[in-house]
Amino acid sequence: MADFDNLFDAAIARADETIRGYMGTSATITSGEQSGAVIRGVFDDPENISYAGQGVRVEGSSPSLFVRTDEVRQLRRGDTLTIGEENFWVDRVSPDDGGSCHLWLGRGVPPAVNRRR
C-alpha cells in the first residue's frame, strides 16, 4: 500500500482493500498489454436505474469495476475483459483516488472506431 500524507487517506485506502476483498469478483483481462492478468474488483452494473429525484446527480449508467490503480496501470481504452461469463471493454479509467480507481465499461466488444491498433 502506498504512503499517505495523513491518517484519513490511509484509513480510506485500507477500507477500499477490505471492500474489494469481501465484495470483489475476479475479472480476466483478455486483450492489451495486461492480457491474461486476473484482477479483483467490485463490479457495479446499474442496468435497472430509476429516474433520479430533484437535486440528484447521476454519474452514469455504465457498468464499472472498482479496482486497485496499481493493478490496471497499463490498461487502455478498448482493452477487453471478462467478468463471469460476460465480455466487457474499457471505455475509460478514472483518475487515481488514494490507490483506487474505477474502470468504466461497455458491454461486448468495443466499437471498431474505438479499438486499439
Curated annotation (Swiss-Prot):
It comes from the Viruses. Keywords: Host cytoplasm, Late protein, Viral capsid assembly, Viral release from host cell, Virion. GO terms for cellular component: host cell cytoplasm; virion component. May bind head-to-tail joining protein W and protein U. InterPro entries: Phage_Head-Tail_Connect_sf (IPR053734), Phage_tail_attach_FII (IPR008018). This is Head-tail connector protein FII. Plays a role in virion assembly by joining the head and the tail at the last step of morphogenesis. Six FII proteins probably bind protein W that closes the DNA-filled capsid, as well as the U tail terminator protein of the pre-assembled tail. One of its GO terms (biological process) is virion assembly. It is found in: Virion; Host cytoplasm. It holds the Pfam family Phage_attach. Coiled coil: none annotated.
